Regions:
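Extended amphipathic alpha-helical repeat scaffolds
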Residues: 1-186
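Generic helix N-cap/helix-start motif at coil->alpha-helix transitions
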Residues: 44-47, 129-133, 164-171, 184-185, ...
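Hydrophobic core positions within HEAT/HEAT-like alpha-solenoid repeats
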Residues: 48, 86, 153, 175, ...
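Alpha-solenoid HEAT/Armadillo repeat architecture
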Residues: 52, 56, 75, 94, ...
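Short sequence/structural elements of tandem HEAT/ARM alpha-solenoid repeats
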Residues: 65, 103-107, 207, 215, ...
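Alpha-solenoid HEAT/Armadillo-like helical repeat scaffolds in large eukaryotic proteins
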Residues: 73, 155-162, 189-197, 208, ...
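Short alpha-helical interface elements
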Residues: 75, 95, 110, 114-118, ...
Length: 250
């Protein structure tokens, strides 16, 4: 009797997994072929649970297809579809464990940056995605991964500096991200690398400092006054010019 029960339970798990995969693949196909799928509130509310089960059953490939098709919909011409895709994606990411969450955000960061470039509306999901990118940028800075930090900061810097024209609401979100990252701790860490080249990342540290704009300008000017080496002064002046500020009399 025990063996029969165990066999029935095993069969039940197999049946559930088969059904889960079938439903998930159908959902993935619908997301790919019909963007209006995103407007089905009941279905979208169940999406994080579906992803949770896919993770539990180690169905990474199927989960990847769903998230990839969601990201594709971030680039729809329909603003409502983009908003729903962003919400569905952030609902999924927020349901993950911290480690898996970071992993997914880093893997999607390139496409999320592209979306930030084209998006025209600030929604709660838009702010959430910006916060995701801020967090991975901070994580990169903490681990001295300055090369990886630059493309993440670049989009926020482009909006903050006006190089990429956006409405006031988007500009404020991006400006806040820059302010949040331009902490005294980060600036000190970056200036240390810029001044010493201890980790052979002086140029990258300089680029990041220039993206912080006028927040780091005073520190740059102080460094310029203190530094007597001609080549170093030229490097710092180039860094100051890189902030996009008006010419300053030296």
């Amino acid at each position: 009797e025990g063996t029969a029960q165990s066999s029935a339970e095993s069969q039940g798990k197999i049946d559930f997994k088969t059904k889960l995969i079938r439903v998930s693949e159908k959902l993935s196909l619908n997301l790919k072929e019909n963007e209006n799928t995103l407007l089905d509130k009941q279905l979208m509310s169940a999406l994080p649970k579906i992803i949770e089960q896919l993770i539990a059953h180690k169905e990474q490939e199927t989960m990847g297809k769903i998230t990839s098709n969601l990201v594709d919909n971030l680039f729809s011409e329909n603003a409502e579809v983009r908003a729903h895709a962003a919400k569905a994606l952030t609902d999924i990411i927020n349901s993950l464990s911290p480690e898996r969450k970071t992993e997914m955000i880093e893997s999607l960061s390139g496409r999320l940056i592209e979306w930030i470039k084209i998006e025209t509306s600030v929604t709660p999901a838009y702010k959430t995605v910006c916060n995701y990118l801020q967090n991975i940028a901070q994580n990169f800075i903490n681990h001295l991964h300055y090369t990886e930090t630059i493309p993440v900061l670049d989009i926020f810097n482009d909006v903050n500096s006006g190089k990429l024209e956006k409405n006031d609401a988007i500009h404020e979100v991006c400006a806040q991200i820059i302010r949040n990252l331009a902490t005294e701790e980060n600036i000190t860490l970056l200036f240390k690398e810029f001044n010493t080249n201890e980790h052979d990342k002086k140029d990258e540290a300089g680029i990041i400092l220039s993206m912080f704009g006028d927040i780091t300008l005073k520190r740059m000017l102080d460094t310029l006054q203190e530094n007597v080496d001609g080549n170093e002064r030229v490097r710092i002046m180039h860094l100051i010019i890189g902030t996009g500020q008006r010419a300053i009399p030296f």
